Amino acid sequence: MASPAAGDVLIVGSGLVGRSWAMLFASGGFRVKLYDIEPRQITGALENIRKEMKSLQQSGSLKGSLSAEEQLSLISSCTNLAEAVEGVVHIQECVPENLDLKRKIFAQLDSIVDDRVVLSSSSSCLLPSKLFTGLAHVKQCIVAHPVNPPYYIPLVELVPHPETSPATVDRTHALMRKIGQSPVRVLKEIDGFVLNRLQYAIISEAWRLVEEGIVSPSDLDLVMSDGLGMRYAFIGPLETMHLNAEGMLSYCDRYSEGMKRVLKSFGSIPEFSGATVEKVNQAMCKKVPADPEHLAARREWRDECLKRLAKLKRQMQPQ
């Protein structure tokens, strides 16, 4: 068995995101401590991780060079936070998206960690200035926002507090790369970070197009899944522009006036209520009934698709 990577990693919270982070860090050879205040929660989490890793190994989708058993041997549980922080180089907070709860956790960590550990939050929308301001170790704090499901979607948004040191950002970026993720540096905090701002822009226009009777809900989704989404799985919108003409300058010269004309026709922010909600809900429930069994099955299918796509992207040589 290969030697563990230098330093331990602590995961605070053993839900879906916490389990995913534990698997990712173990795949990179790190010893992982999984902390939760509820022992039964940790027991269930470890069993879930074991089943998932065995399944991934059988399908050839397990990350890292270690076997499932070797990775599992790197993951341990703990219920004492003061003991859990001993020897760790990185702490990844994964508790529910509640500002008061997260601030409480970071206040506890702030009082027991040294000056070397990185304090990282998995928050999807809470600004670092709300989470970390006032902490003694604020220079060591950063948001590392994963995308659900983190094991199959490698993007991680790194969002620093205004007082976060450049060294903390660099260390976290290098760590994410080491465990096979694709970190991006959000240079300054902004509500929604980058991914959700792009996602909400798409959702907003999609909603307006359905609301105004331009396209049906099912066809709207098809535009993304069988159109834009196929390109965006491999190249982003800016490179798409670059390739759709003789470079970026050519694209802007050719198409900027048309883009501005269309953009001026965009409407106001939708209310996401009323008749359109019923229309969209009816279309979605026709495709996937909104009961636990059907939703779980569809999520499983989605994750299988993402698993295969991730495998394909790993196999393809980046240009």
From Swiss-Prot:
A single cellular component GO annotation: cytosol
Effect of mutating residue 145 to Q: Abolishes enzyme activity
A single GO molecular function term of this UniProt record: structural constituent of eye lens
Chief localisation class: cytoplasm
Tissue expression from the record: Detected in eye lens, kidney, liver, heart, lung, brain and testis.
GO biological process: fatty acid metabolic process
Keyword NAD: yes
N-acetylalanine PTM positions: 2
Subcellular location field: Cytoplasm
Pfam families with a match to the protein in the record: 3HCDH (PF00725), 3HCDH_N (PF02737)
Phenotype when changing residue 36 to R: Reduces enzyme activity and alters specificity, so that NADP can be used as cosubstrate
EC main group: oxidoreductase
Phosphoserine sites (modified residues): 3, 111
Parts of the chain that traverse the membrane: none
Enzyme Commission code: 1.1.1.45
Catalyzed reactions per annotation: L-gulonate + NAD(+) = 3-dehydro-L-gulonate + NADH + H(+)
Regulation: Inhibited by malonate and by inorganic phosphate.
Amino-acid positions noted as binding NAD(+) in the UniProt annotation, renumbered to this chain: 16-17, 36, 97, 102
Entry keyword set: Acetylation, Cytoplasm, Eye lens protein, NAD, Oxidoreductase, Phosphoprotein
Subunit structure: Homodimer.
Family: Belongs to the 3-hydroxyacyl-CoA dehydrogenase family.
PANTHER family for this protein: 3-HYDROXYACYL-COA DEHYDROGENASE FAMILY PROTEIN, LAMBDA-CRYSTALLIN HOMOLOG
Functional summary from the UniProt entry: Functions as a crystallin in the rabbit eye lens. Has high L-gulonate 3-dehydrogenase activity. It also exhibits low dehydrogenase activity toward L-3-hydroxybutyrate (HBA) and L-threonate.
Record-given protein name: Lambda-crystallin
Highest classification ranks of the organism: Eukaryota, Metazoa, Chordata, Craniata, Vertebrata
